[in-house]
Amino acid sequence: MLATQQSKSSNTFEKANELLASDKVLSEQERKDRLKAKRIRIARLRQHEAKFQEEAQWVFKHFTQHFSAVLAQSEKQLESAYRIRHEVFCEETRIFEGNDTKLESDAYDEYAEQCLIQHDKSGDYAGCVRLIMPEADNETLPIEKQGVQYIDRKDLLPCNFPRNEIAEVSRILIPKVFRQRKIDKAACAANTGINIELYDENDIRCFPFIAVGLYMACTAMFKNRGKKHIYFMADPRLGKSMQVVGLTMTQIGDEFEYVGRRVPYYIDFENFLENLKPSFKFMLDEMIKTIK
């Protein structure tokens, strides 16, 4: 039996040597090609990043000339936010069941504020976000009910901080028409009621950055409300996109299932502001003026 094992070990060793030898030959032959391919990939990534940064700089400078952050205070404005939520969650993705009012809301809205991004020329709303800001002990965050068991960083649990210092970002949504790069004007008018003729090339150029506008609207709100500890159960892709554009967040747990795939994030607000890029600060300063 020992001999058999030794024989097997010997054969395995010989095969390993053959593979190593083969790999050396292959790597020698392919080394230059692989190195060239790697350099091409790096060059393309750098080119893409440079193009993105160039586009971002333009948008950050001009975004607030075309779009404004609006704190929903009137019944009409609140309904506009709830309507976007119904459109995306109930009609488009069908995550929630729709209703006859075409408005989506829940119990958290009782101690939350809604913010909208509005296109100045047309008055259309291009996105919404909900900011849940509890004050009383019986007012909880969604992450405390749905995601707390997935949080590994126990030192960053919401219960460790005063209730009036915590908040959660949720329902950050953009209507489908504003998520498109190419727009069929006739179909847009027929299906959404939005007159895309009122949008010039610069307006449409800002569309991919509406999400950033919503992030900055949140930031302006939290700054004005004195919030220090922010939580966010984000779609993994959304979380990554926020970090790609330079918005710093700390992942505090594993991905889990809640209204789709979600990742729990924590934002130390003071640290977030300190690390904010100059281009973001420009947009933030403009929004702080309009959101009180």
Residue positions per predicted region:
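Acyl-donor binding region in acyl/amide transferases
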Residues: 136-249, 253-266
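Charge-rich, low-complexity intrinsically disordered segments
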Residues: 247-292
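Conserved beta-strand in the GNAT
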Residues: 116, 123-133
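Conserved N-terminal entry element of GNAT/NAT acetyltransferase domains
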Residues: 27-75
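Short acidic (Asp/Glu) patches
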Residues: 97-103, 109-114, 142-157
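Secondary-structure boundary elements
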Residues: 77, 91, 119-122, 220-229
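Short amphipathic alpha-helix that is part of the acyltransferase structural core
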Residues: 55-103, 110, 114-118
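Intrinsically disordered, low-structural-confidence terminal and linker regions
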Residues: 1-27
